Regions:
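Non-heme di-metal
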Residues: 1-205
């Protein structure tokens, strides 16, 4: 994982920086967090597969995103295994105010669906990377520290892949402008969410 640092903490180029206290709040219910995390991995795999299925004419998508889908499913299996070993179970998928906010907030100004999907995937991976970094540094649960530390490299790789695909397939000025708009939207959405034991929850009250 490579990123800039500010005061010793990585900067993930997000409009809103999650406070360090978020990790302790999210870990108050580790089973709920793990169940939600597993669903995040599953949805990420589905997103990668859908991008391939709907855009097979783009060879860069066709040949890069299947590997992302496989990696996300491997992460899903690992998280579910830890969840079950702790006596928990995968709960039914709940609605995601985070994803809903991103898609509803971007729909009215959207000019190209593929561009938005790539950029939103990039931003979601960036936010997940930031949250996993915080969880990997939170004392008290060595197993989860190891889990989230192990996932940082792949999350950073996926984050970079999605923005690079956007830059390859669309004019750079268009990508830069739209990414800036969506980055600000993402920051507003997640800052306004309620606190909970979910990967993409709001800050502590």
């Amino acid at each position: 994982m490579s990123s800039e640092t500010l005061g010793g903490r990585p900067v993930f180029r997000l409009a809103y920086q999650t406070p360090s206290s978020w990790a302790a709040m999210a870990l108050q219910d580790p089973l709920a967090l793990l169940s939600d995390h597993a669903h995040c991995e599953l949805k990420a795999a589905i997103t990668a597969q859908a991008l391939v299925a709907k855009n097979p004419e783009h060879s860069s998508i066709l040949h890069s995103l299947p590997r992302v889908a496989i990696e996300e499913l491997e992460h899903f299996e690992r998280v579910v295994q830890i969840l079950e070993e702790r006596g928990g179970k995968l709960e039914p998928q709940a609605s995601s105010p985070y994803a809903d906010g991103l898609h509803k907030g971007s729909a009215g100004t959207r000019n190209n669906l593929l561009l938005d999907r790539l950029l939103l995937a990039h931003l979601i991976e960036a936010r997940s990377l930031e949250r996993f970094h915080l969880l990997s540094k939170e004392d008290g649960d060595t197993e989860l520290q190891e889990l989230y530390s192990d996932l940082l490299v792949s999350e950073a790789s996926h984050r970079a892949l999605f923005i690079n695909l956007a830059r390859e397939l669309f004019p750079l000025d268009k990508v830069t402008t739209r990414e800036g708009f969506l980055r600000e939207l993402e920051g507003r959405v997640i800052e306004g969410l309620a606190p909970s034991s979910r990967v993409h929850s709001g800050p502590p009250a």
